[in-house]
């Protein structure tokens, strides 16, 4: 295991799982909010999300490397284990794969295992209303709710209308997770 200073100080550790979305570059808003609330933060990005975020800025802000690929056996773990997970922004693709138990990326692998470990998890969807109209989406959200996943309140935006970035409440992930973390303490 790597040196894990957040464990030594008893600071809770949050994994922020970032998906490839037009607002992913604003993930620093959630990181700042979590750090201001005394969380340690590590970022796990889907492979496609790496093209949407400023990786150097995120790594400087968190003090940890961004994880996107599985590590080799025997390599040190670059992040402490999570006390909670926020998936923000969560795309249509990731939500549906996660609910179906598909773990073809590190991010999805972590999410699929989180259920078995009982790690409090919040998902903050960001998608358009045409995607949300697909029956798989509502079924996936229902499955995630049954798994105890906390679902953010973002209402899907109109397709090809500029998105709803101004409506996206990054901090809601912490609002959802904090009571769950307090209950575990």
Mark where each language-model region is.
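A cross-family phosphate/adenosyl-ligand binding-site feature
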Residues: 1-185
